[in-house]
Amino acid sequence: MNDKIKKEWFVYMIRCMDNSLYTGITTDVKRRYEEHEKGRGAKYTKVRKPIKICTVFQVEDRSSAGKLEYFIKNLSKKEKEILISDEKNKKNFINYAEEKLKIKIN
């Protein structure tokens, strides 16, 4: 019998001190953000210190997280800013991304 517990995966966007947006994936957003704050996260956030989490998406598995992360990272800065600007835009993005990527975003 397989008793593996299915991990939740998250895609998160962080605002950095230089006003840029960093996108990453994790199973624990709080822990990962703390790593970024302490300079133990990605090279990107070591240089561009994180100041806040802008948004978080929950997905079903690692594969879905990777697909969504890649998709977001390929958006323009303007598109990313629109995405995080309000809940309506986020919901519209979720609907579009679910259809385009064939994944479920919670």
Protein language model regions, located:
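C-terminal alpha-helical interaction appendages
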Residues: 44-47
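GIY-YIG nuclease catalytic motif and its immediate N-terminal context
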Residues: 1-38, 49, 53-56, 66-67, ...
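Short arginine-rich
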Residues: 70-85
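Residues at or immediately preceding the N-termini of alpha-helices
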Residues: 29-30, 61-64, 77
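A structural signal for short, well-ordered beta-strand elements
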Residues: 25, 58-60, 73
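Flexible, gly/pro- and Lys/Arg-enriched active-site loops
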Residues: 41
